[in-house]
Curated annotation (Swiss-Prot):
This is Anaerobic ribonucleoside-triphosphate reductase. It catalyses: a ribonucleoside 5'-triphosphate + formate + H(+) = a 2'-deoxyribonucleoside 5'-triphosphate + CO2 + H2O. Activated under anaerobic conditions by NrdG, a tightly associated activase. Activation involves the formation of a glycyl radical at Gly-580. Zn(2+) binds at residues 543, 546, 561, 564. DCTP 1 binds at residues 64, 66, 445-448. NCBIfam families: NrdD, PRK09263.1. One of its GO terms (biological process) is 2'-deoxyribonucleotide biosynthetic process. DGTP 2 binds at residues 100, 103, 146. Keywords: Metal-binding, Organic radical, Oxidoreductase, Zinc.
Length: 605
């Protein structure tokens, strides 16, 4: 398709694949349309920058070069862990303003909102603020000290309780303001920032206060109708001795988190024990965006560094296509499969190195917030080369994959763990050869679940239980149609967390658990013992016509209230997990394949 035809499809709203490509982008509004138009141009520029054999593989569905609407036309990077602590402690310049260390929690979260918008506008992937309970604790203490000072100045009786009460209100208000800021602003990418905040390991009174404020705000919801916010994504660490069991000091906060999850789906949880075992870190590692994980890395002085690090991009390998291409007549040929697998791994390496090469010679001045003002943990000079920051394992670059479920069907046996182990062996060789940290990433595949399946259908027709569904299964996940218990699903997916260490998440589908928090806790605890990163999908919908909070029924034409039959999308709030993030399909539609996949999800019970 020519660039003119693609732009016409955007302007006249006839290109549904483009308009519904990203569930977080409202393609009806000017900023998003402008970003989509720029993306069309960037894709055409990429055709002249990326070697033709890579572009051909991308366009035919053998591989997928992610975010080609941003990179390599411009030297964007993917997702990151923002060094919020360093930025707040050392100050930084934002636009025309010199930001100093905040003196209160309200100012600290206001600055965090501005950092969120700036970072999201200078990269194409997700933004994470890790361990905000610990990082923002000093600003709660400053707020408390100010209230003590006021109480003494005005001779307020019971100064300690006064200061405690005022501080608690200030912390709550600070995170309420942050949540509203995030959900009302647009980045230059034409979307709400993909932002994640993690918490849960702090046990002092200020850290506990922050955790409670985050959860209570999420439980309350947004606006008059108390709708479920999409962002920030909430991720809570669970750990024995901190919050996992009844005798732990933060067990009460875990109970609040369970209530929150039952009403808002978030927080997702990370098992601190398994996370440290997987990443090699001495402290739990937060996901960059929805699921990308860094491994341990030490600076020149031997200190472990997490905040300020990032990912350089993803290329995803179409595993079902390798199997489909390995059939000779009606028989699967193992030797041909091995040959094609190795060829396509080499292809992925070239595609990833092409992405890295696009960053060579680029100066820090292209993204001051990232490279000069501390978001990436450094203060480079404007003319410094950014590529040096990414070498020797400081940044990751990821190889993704999709369709283990379909691959197993085509091969005729459970080959998933075997194939991922072989992929890891290749990645290790690439890392040793180049000095860049290649990681194995379980691709979310919000749009790719449909794109790959559609292209494979065009080539091979309708293949039973593979292409006939209209979507490919997300990474290593069990088929969404398989009727098993949540514990069985966790057990079957858990081994993949320890293989695909560069990115993974598992989730289960449960019925309404608001009145069964003990049951929800049992699922959480089982997940915490067996895998790393986990979420639960539960009904959190709301019909504004009848007031029902039952799950809206998905159909090919939209959602229907199961109580009153309402179909007007403006009269209901529907929330679904698209892949790692939540989305509102009535506000920002899913692609055809993802919509079909959601319709076929069964409850695990």
């Amino acid at each position: 398709m020519t660039i003119e035809k693609e732009i016409e499809g955007l302007i006249h709203k006839t290109n549904k694949d483009l308009l519904n490509e990203n569930a977080n982008k409202d393609s009806r509004v000017f900023p998003t349309q402008r970003d989509l138009m720029a993306g069309i141009v960037s894709k055409h520029i990429a055709k002249n920058m990326v070697p033709s054999f890579i572009m051909k593989a991308h366009e035919s569905g053998i591989i997928h070069v992610h975010d080609i609407d941003y990179s390599p036309a411009l030297p964007f990077t993917n997702c990151c862990l923002v060094d919020l602590k360093g930025m707040l402690e050392n100050g930084f310049k934002l636009g025309n303003a010199q930001i100093e260390t905040p003196k209160s929690i309200g100012v600290a979260t206001a600055i965090m909102a501005q950092i969120t918008a700036q970072v999201a506008s200078h990269q194409y992937g997700g933004t994470t603020f890790a361990n905000v309970d610990k990082v923002l604790s000093p600003y709660v203490k400053r707020t408390y000290a100010k209230h003590i000072e006021d109480a003494e100045k005005w001779q307020i009786a019971d100064a300690l309780n006064y200061a405690q009460s005022k501080t608690e209100k200030d912390v709550y208000d600070a995170f309420q303001a942050y949540e509203y800021e995030v959900n009302t602003l647009f980045s230059s990418n034409g979307q709400t920032p993909f932002v994640t905040i993690t918490f849960g390991t702090g046990t002092d009174w200020t850290e506990r206060m922050i955790q409670k404020a985050i959860l209570k705000n999420r439980i309350k919801g947004l606006g008059r109708d108390g709708i479920t916010p999409i962002f920030p994504k909430l991720v809570m660490f669970v750990e024995e001795g901190v919050n996992l069991y009844k005798d732990d000091p933060n067990y009460d906060i875990k109970q609040l988190a369970l209530e929150c999850a039952s009403k808002r789906m978030y927080p997702d949880i990370i098992s601190a024990k398994n996370n440290k075992a997987i990443t090699g870190s001495s402290v739990p590692v937060s996901p960059m965006g929805c699921r990308s994980f860094l491994s341990v890395w030490k600076d020149s002085t031997g200190n472990e560094i997490l905040d300020g690090r990032n990912n350089l991009g993803v290329v995803t390998l179409n595993l079902p296509r390798i199997a489909l291409d390995s059939y000779i007549g009606t028989q699967f040929n193992e030797q041909k499969f091995v040959e094609l697998f190795n060829e396509r791994m080499d292809l992925c390496f070239e595609a990833l190195m092409c992405r890295i090469s696009s960053l060579k010679g680029v100066k820090a001045t292209v993204a001051p917030i990232l490279y000069q003002e501390g978001a990436f943990g450094v203060r480079l000079k404007p003319d410094d080369d950014i590529i040096e920051l990414f070498k020797n394992g400081r940044s990751s670059v990821s190889l993704g994959y999709i369709g283990i479920h379909e691959l197993n069907i085509l091969v005729g046996r459970d080959i998933g763990r075997e194939i991922l182990t072989k992929m890891n062996a290749h990645l290790k060789q690439w890392t040793e050869r180049t000095g860049f940290a290649f990681s194995l990433y379980s691709t979310p595949a919000e749009n790719l679940c449909y794109r790959f399946c559609k292209l494979d259908t065009e080539k091979y027709g309708s293949v039973k239980d593979v292409t006939d569904k209209g979507w490919y299964t997300n990474s290593f996940h069990v088929s969404v149609e398989e009727n098993i218990t949540p514990f069985e699903k966790i057990s079957r997916e858990a081994p993949y967390h320890f293989i695909a260490t560069g990115g993974h998440i598992s989730y289960v589908e449960l019925p309404d658990m608001k009145n069964n928090l003990k049951g929800l806790e049992a699922v959480w605890d089982y997940a915490a013992q067996h895998l790393d990163y986990f979420g639960v999908n539960m009904p959190v919908d709301k019909c504004f016509t009848c007031g029902s909070t039952h799950e809206m029924t998905p159909t090919e034409n939209g959602f229907v209230c199961s109580i009153c039959g309402e179909t007007d999308p403006k009269k209901m709030n529907t929330i679904r997990r698209t892949c790692g993030y939540l989305g509102n399909p009535n506000e920002r539609g899913f692609n055809l394949g993802k919509n079909k996949e959601i319709m076929h999800r069964v409850k695990h019970q």
